[in-house]
């Protein structure tokens, strides 16, 4: 049975446990704390404190997410969409994508090798046979 999050100490402890596993965005962390029974009146001040102390960082979360998803073969369009769905500001997402050290052309080649065994289609009509490839944002036709 999980503990009730009815005190600032309990909320902070749970938030730090979640952050110890991986970086979280503020919106995501708020959602997880709410799911565990914490109220917004107690969540917000604790998240503000964690951010002031440098323990909760949107910039680190963006960097970590971009690195992870690009490493899984996703392109900037898909990553941008996923981060937007997670409640992050469009300007922050764009800045993080610009500042990321991801070589998108190299990632695209890696994904191409993995999905098509390095074979180049003879024409553009061959690409729709793998629509999932273009949806990842890694397609050379986009």
Swiss-Prot record:
Role, per record: Modulates RecA activity.
Superkingdom in the source lineage: Bacteria
Entry-linked PANTHER family: REGULATORY PROTEIN RECX FAMILY PROTEIN
Origin organism lineage: Bacteria, Pseudomonadati, Pseudomonadota, Gammaproteobacteria, Pseudomonadales
UniProt keyword terms in alphabetical order: Cytoplasm
Encoding gene, per UniProt annotation: recX
Principal subcellular localization: cytoplasm
Entry-linked Gene3D superfamilies: Winged helix-like DNA-binding domain superfamily/Winged helix DNA-binding domain
Species this protein is from: Pseudomonas putida
Record region (Disordered): 118-142
Compartments (UniProt record): Cytoplasm
Family: Belongs to the RecX family.
Biological processes per GO annotation: regulation of DNA repair
Name this protein carries in UniProt: Regulatory protein RecX
GO terms for cellular component: cytoplasm
Family matches, as InterPro entries: RecX_HTH_1st, RecX_HTH_2nd, Regulatory_RecX, WH-like_DNA-bd_sf
């Amino acid at each position: 049975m999980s503990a009730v999050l009815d005190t600032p100490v309990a909320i902070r402890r749970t938030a730090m446990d979640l952050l110890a596993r991986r970086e979280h965005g503020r919106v995501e962390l708020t959602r997880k704390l709410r799911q565990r029974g914490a109220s917004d009146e107690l969540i917000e001040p604790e998240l503000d404190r964690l951010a002031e102390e440098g323990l909760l960082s949107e910039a680190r979360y963006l960097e970590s997410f971009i690195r992870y998803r690009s490493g899984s073969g996703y392109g900037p369009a898909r990553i941008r969409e996923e981060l937007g769905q997670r409640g992050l500001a469009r300007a922050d997402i764009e800045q993080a994508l610009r500042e990321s050290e991801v070589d998108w052309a190299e990632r695209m080649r890696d994904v191409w090798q993995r999905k098509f065994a390095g074979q180049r289609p003879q024409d553009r009509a061959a690409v729709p046979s793998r629509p999932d490839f273009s949806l990842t944002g890694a397609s050379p036709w986009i």
